[in-house]
Regions:
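Vicinal oxygen chelate
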Residues: 1-8, 30-79, 89-116, 128-130
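Short, conserved charged micro-motifs
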Residues: 18, 85-89
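Conserved active-site tyrosine of GNAT-family acetyltransferases
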Residues: 19-24, 92, 120
Length: 130
């Protein structure tokens, strides 16, 4: 099989145009490729370096408690490192995201803000503190 070359997270959005505007325009992810055909529309956005974080349910609940004050995560949540999590959260809220928690400084010295995107995806915006 060889090593994995790319992690591509596919988000199915009921309102494709709204989701594209949110991730492309508000979050600032540049479009690498897009298409429209008889099957529908799609776009690939550059989200920088990707990692896959696998958590136990108890760890997820621990993070939820810190960020939101209660368990709230589904099976997938985007955690995005940004330069300023508070400013980024405000920009995304103006684009339709709903704040679920934060800002909060975590025990691992990140400033986190939890949001829910218009398509329902949970987002943690985090800034590593010096």
């Amino acid at each position: 099989m060889g090593p994995v070359r790319e992690l591509r997270v596919a988000v199915t959005a009921e309102d494709y145009e709204e989701a594209l505007r949110f991730y492309r325009d508000a979050l600032g992810l540049p479009v690498i490729e897009s298409w429209e055909n008889e099957g529908g529309s799609g776009a690939i956005l550059d989200a920088g370096r990707a990692t896959l974080e696998v958590l136990s349910r108890s760890q997820t609940d621990f993070v939820d408690e810190i960020e939101v004050g209660r368990p709230s995560s589904g099976p997938v949540r985007f955690a995005l490192e940004v330069e300023d999590s508070v400013e980024a959260a405000e920009r995304l809220e103006a684009a339709g995201a709903e704040r679920e928690g934060g800002p909060v400084v975590t025990p691992w010295q990140h400033r986190n803000v939890r949001l829910r995107a218009p398509d329902g995806m949970q987002l943690t915006l985090f800034t590593v503190l010096d």
